[in-house]
Amino acid sequence: MPRSLKKGPFVAYHLLKKIDKMNASGKKDVITTWSRTSTILPTMVGHTIAVYNGRQHVPIFISDQLVGHKLGEFVSTRTFKSHIKTDKKTKR
């Protein structure tokens, strides 16, 4: 279920504070965060945010198409390990 419109989107306070400070100064540094549940707002467009996936911080450049989504949607937490594809002759 989507979040109630009455409540508004969730954004971590520390992340919003860093974005506002960088917008005021005009800087474009990489912002590291662990908040995967934060919603991407229009004020974040143009910034690079490094989101933690459990092992490392993965940088995401925020563009117009990402507004309204969560930060965690673009950073996978699980690595896919496929099975080794071998020849049919070796299985016999």
UniProtKB/Swiss-Prot annotation:
Cellular component annotations (GO), alphabetically ordered: chloroplast; mitochondrial small ribosomal subunit
- Top-level division of the source organism's lineage: Eukaryota
Subcellular location, record wording = Plastid, Chloroplast
Name the GO terms of the biological process aspect.
Answer: ribosomal small subunit assembly; translation
Keyword annotations for this protein? Answer: Chloroplast, Plastid, Ribonucleoprotein, Ribosomal protein, RNA-binding, rRNA-binding
Major site of localization recorded for this protein: plastid
GO molecular function terms attached to this record: rRNA binding; structural constituent of ribosome
| Alphabetized InterPro entries for the sequence | Ribosomal_uS19, Ribosomal_uS19_bac-type, Ribosomal_uS19_CS, Ribosomal_uS19_SF
The protein's matches in NCBIfam families, at most eight in alphabetical order, are given as: rpsS_bact
Q: What family does the Swiss-Prot or TrEMBL record give for this protein?
A: Belongs to the universal ribosomal protein uS19 family.
PANTHER family in UniProt = RIBOSOMAL PROTEIN S19P FAMILY MEMBER, SMALL RIBOSOMAL SUBUNIT PROTEIN US19M
Per the entry, what this protein does is:
Protein S19 forms a complex with S13 that binds strongly to the 16S ribosomal RNA.
**Record's protein name:** Small ribosomal subunit protein uS19c
